[in-house]
């Protein structure tokens, strides 16, 4: 009986450990940190800079209260967003009409992502880091995470 209880306890611990190391279903997929052409500061130029968040899981996920942050401390907080399984939400830096879950707008009047080096951090509603994506490049304008 003691051997069975020990085996069950070990199985529970191993299952919990595997679950805690499983990759998150919500991930940063890509960052376009340098909009094409000159950085004019126009809304069109700002909106050509974006980050995509992908639901890699098998069910829809609510992102209410989740946050994206750059290294400088610019923060976007997701409102009431349901991201279907397998779908991507593109968060544009500038202003525009939100079409959740596909296109969201930060409504910033300045560029969020540094053209040379930056890091995006995705946090859930509890403030836990879910994913990070960093880049250090002058030869490309997009980072696949």
Label for each model-derived stretch:
Residues 64-70:
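Short Gly/aromatic-enriched secondary-structure transition segments
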Residues 73-108:
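Intrinsically disordered, low-complexity Pro/Gly/Ser/Thr-rich segments with frequent PxxP/GP/PP motifs
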Residues 76-81, 128-139:
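Short amphipathic beta-strand/extended segments with alternating polar/hydrophobic composition
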């Amino acid at each position: 009986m003691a051997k069975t209880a020990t085996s069950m306890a070990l199985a529970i611990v191993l299952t919990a450990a595997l679950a805690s190391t499983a990759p998150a279903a919500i991930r940063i997929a890509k960052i376009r940190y340098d909009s094409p052409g000159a950085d004019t500061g126009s809304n069109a130029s700002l909106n050509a800079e974006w980050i995509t968040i992908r639901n890699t899981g098998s069910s829809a996920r609510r992102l209410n209260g989740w946050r994206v942050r750059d290294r400088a401390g610019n923060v976007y907080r997701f409102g009431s967003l349901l991201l279907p399984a397998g779908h991507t939400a593109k968060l544009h830096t500038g202003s525009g009409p939100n079409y959740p879950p596909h296109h969201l707008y930060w409504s910033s009047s300045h560029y969020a992502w540094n053209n040379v080096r930056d890091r995006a951090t995705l946090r859930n509603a509890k403030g836990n880091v879910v994913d990070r994506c960093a880049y250090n490049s002058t030869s490309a304008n997009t980072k696949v995470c």
